[in-house]
Amino acid sequence: MQNHAKQKILYLESLRGVAALIVAIFHFDIGSIFNNELTKNGWLMVDFFFVLSGFVISFNYLDKIKSFSDIVQFQIKRFFRLYPLHIIMLFIFLVIECSKYLVKLKFGLSSTIPAFTYNNLNTFITNILLLHNLVDNRLTWNVQSWSISSEFFTYFLFGLIILFSARKKLIINILSIVIVLLSFYFLQNHSMEPKYGFIRCLYSFFLGVLIFNFSNSFKFKITNYLSYIFFILSILLVIIAEPEKIIGINIFLPLIFSAFILSLIMSQNKNYLIYLLERKFLIYL
């Protein structure tokens, strides 16, 4: 079972790589053949990441967190995985803000948004502490780092739930369902914008926790055609998704992503999607 599960992780890593590529193209906003509806809505792949993270983190740590010191060690590992690049990018943006200020001071040239208007001392401190997506009312500095802030504290909440539930799956599942439902309700009445990123992360991450527990509890196999259907449905819904400020179908995407991942995990042998995703060039991606 363990070896089989580890084999499954390989194609999930490939999915992570493909999603990362789509997100990167979305942020670079490059033209040509890459400028299409799939990449224009590539921001939704972040939610795919969150679902995957919920599954993978549960797979690796659900049975390992037995004390508060285990949570601390878990958070330290997450910290050193997320923080180094975040702090490097933060100081790069600090250099940019200082350059804008000096150019204004010396040459009288000002940018559309003057230096340190939003990227100021207060938001710099919240970014240093990874609190920015939880407490700031807008995105600042390296705006894409909102997901890092959200993930870090979602991981911490996950650790607390595992610890205080004594790893009892029924309690974990009930709490996960409550978090998913409350997050869904909140987002439905607001939006999927990054300023609500923490709630968005909770929603998708704990869906990932739920599909891990489901796949780990029920060993039956389902037809491969379900994974093909959910794969096509995921792509189609991303293509026709609404802008971030409009809820529309966007709020249902994490549910479809979860169904797709679960259908892969519980699929029968000779699944062509798994065969493709286990090719080395995709794993290395």
What do these predicted ranges mean?
Residues 21, 87, 91-95, 99, ...:
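Generic alpha-helical transmembrane segments of integral inner-membrane proteins
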Residues 1-12, 18-42, 58-72, 135-136, ...:
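Alpha-helical transmembrane segments in multi-pass integral membrane proteins
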Residues 9-12, 73-74, 82, 147, ...:
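Alpha-helical transmembrane segments and their helix-entry boundary regions
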Residues 20-23, 50-56, 90-93, 123, ...:
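Helical transmembrane-bundle signal
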Residues 46-80, 85-110, 209-213, 265-268:
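Juxtamembrane transmembrane-helix termini
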Residues 16, 24, 47, 54, ...:
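Divalent metal-coordination and catalytic microenvironments
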Residues 83-150, 184, 255-261, 265-266:
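Membrane-interface helix-loop-helix regions
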Residues 13, 17-20, 53, 84-90, ...:
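Residues within membrane-spanning alpha-helices of integral membrane proteins
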